[in-house]
């Protein structure tokens, strides 16, 4: 996985202006298309689009108001989540709805939202800490609310994933004012800390089950803190288990998550030991390292580029994916983008798949044809039922579809032809469904070859 967070909170990555007049809507859409074009050009295959910020959303919802930064809380004239999903899929990029879970706004934000705020509508569900409002994870009604909120997104939109943010207790959690909730819904057999951990895990479980009930191919993930717990010789006071009652390893191991993206915005001894801990204690392919490319900015740490470069190199060697926080920082650091294009992401990559519960594979995209014309190879094939994307392989050597360096294109389901400026001797194509299950391949080696004569274990 090669992912980027597109942050909408405060319009940090998008939008640059709210919708006031009709032309603003088209400006917002044009900005999103520019962002996605750039991400496609550097090899990104997954977008985490921030669809819910603090009690406000970027889609049509029966539960929460339109975001002020989008359109001053009014209907903007289009649906940004539907738009970004469609544009991502045109580029064969996965779009995951990034949802902030428990924070619902500062005092100022809640006051500005007025009667439409979560706090005004459900005051008994909310707690205040240090001038910020939060849904109380210990209140059973909050679990039902978040499950319904996520269910609405999955039901209405063609998302590829649900990405949960802030699915934990707040910083300075020991001061979180939930003693009344603990007395009402807690258990004498559990400590406050264990009760809180169970609250978070229960909400994660409810969301996961709701997503899979509605659309089992939709992936469920979250961005936990970057360090699970202190390691011997490497203390980490601000960690999942020691600070915020968050147990993402358990979510993975018990089948309540499809992958996690720890926010590993650290370096040296605060990064590498914890990366190895995540990778060695979680199922293979289920950890995506969140990389803090914002740390390259002078005001955010002024890291030398070599720090991020080493982290990318290490995660690639370990088979761990990368997610970059956030788009604007990736956009402004030209050297990083150049390295992605010329070195790290020279070849397209396939996002991790899911187990297909119906054990069905897509049809084969038959009639693969390659025609050379003026130094360009024009390639075409027939549509395949069940395809969500097509994966094209090409090489001048023997085809080996078990390695990624022969992938030359990943194309959306409505595209059945493409052109390559570099000619190859051998080609193969497969259809891939929403679970990542691949069809039988079709080959071209100067003439079409029947797939069962060259069966490859994928």
Language-model-derived ranges and their functions:
Residues 248-271, 283-358:
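Substrate-binding cleft of secreted/luminal carbohydrate-active enzymes
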Residues 11-26, 63-78, 129-144, 189-200, ...:
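The substrate-binding groove and active-site-proximal loops of carbohydrate-active enzymes
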Residues 8, 218-237, 275-308:
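Active-site clefts of carbohydrate-active enzymes
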Residues 5-30, 86, 96-97, 102-156:
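Active-site-adjacent "subsite" loops/lids of carbohydrate-active enzymes
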Residues 38, 44-45, 52, 82, ...:
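Polysaccharide-binding and catalytic clefts of secreted carbohydrate-active enzymes
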Residues 338-386, 435-458:
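Pro/Thr/Ser/Gly-rich low-complexity, intrinsically disordered linker/stalk tracts
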Residues 418-439:
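Beta-strand-rich modules
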Residues 42-76:
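Aromatic-lined carbohydrate-binding/catalytic grooves of carbohydrate-active enzymes
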């Amino acid at each position: 996985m090669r992912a980027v967070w597109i942050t909408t909170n405060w319009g940090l990555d998008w939008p640059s202006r709210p919708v006031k007049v009709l032309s603003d809507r088209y400006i917002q859409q044009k900005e999103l298309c520019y962002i996605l074009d750039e991400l496609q050009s550097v090899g990104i295959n997954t977008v985490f689009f921030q669809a819910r910020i603090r009690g406000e959303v970027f889609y049509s919802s029966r539960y929460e108001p339109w975001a002020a930064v989008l359109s001053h809380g009014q209907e903007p004239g289009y649906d940004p989540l539907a738009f970004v999903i469609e544009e991502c899929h045109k580029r064969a990029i996965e779009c995951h709805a990034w949802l902030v879970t428990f924070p619902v706004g500062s005092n100022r934000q809640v006051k500005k939202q007025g009667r439409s705020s979560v706090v005004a509508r459900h005051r008994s569900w909310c707690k205040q800490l240090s001038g910020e409002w939060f849904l109380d994870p210990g209140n059973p009604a909050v679990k039902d609310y978040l499950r319904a909120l996520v269910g609405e997104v999955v039901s209405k939109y063609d998302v590829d994933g649900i990405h949960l943010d802030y699915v934990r207790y707040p910083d300075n959690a020991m001061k979180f004012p939930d003693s009344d909730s603990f007395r009402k819904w807690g258990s004498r057999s559990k400590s406050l800390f264990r009760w809180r951990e169970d609250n978070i895990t229960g909400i994660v479980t409810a969301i996961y089950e709701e997503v899979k009930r509605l659309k089992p191919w939709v992936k469920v993930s979250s961005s936990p803190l970057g360090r699970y717990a202190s390691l011997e010789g490497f203390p980490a006071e601000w960690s999942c288990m020691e600070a915020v009652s968050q147990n993402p390893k358990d979510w993975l191991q018990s089948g309540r998550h499809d992958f996690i993206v720890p926010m590993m915005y650290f370096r040296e001894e605060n990064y590498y030991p914890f990366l190895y801990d995540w990778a060695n204690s979680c199922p293979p392919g289920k950890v995506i390292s969140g990389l803090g490319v914002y740390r390259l900015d002078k005001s955010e740490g002024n890291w030398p580029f070599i720090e991020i470069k080493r982290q990318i190199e290490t995660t690639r060697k370990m088979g761990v994916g990368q997610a970059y926080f956030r788009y604007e920082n990736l956009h402004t650091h030209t050297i990083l983008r150049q390295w992605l294009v010329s070195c790290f992401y020279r070849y397209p990559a396939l996002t991790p798949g899911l187990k297909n519960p119906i054990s069905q594979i897509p049809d084969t995209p038959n009639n693969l044809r390659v025609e050379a014309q003026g130094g360009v190879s024009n390639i075409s094939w027939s549509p395949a039922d069940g395809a969500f994307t097509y994966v094209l392989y090409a090489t001048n050597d023997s085809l080996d579809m078990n390695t990624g360096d022969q992938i030359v294109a990943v194309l959306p389901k409505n595209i059945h032809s493409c052109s390559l400026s570099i000619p190859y001797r051998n080609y193969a194509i497969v259809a891939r469904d929403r679970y990542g299950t691949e069809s039988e391949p079709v080959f071209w080696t100067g003439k079409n070859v029947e797939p069962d004569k060259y069966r490859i274990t994928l």
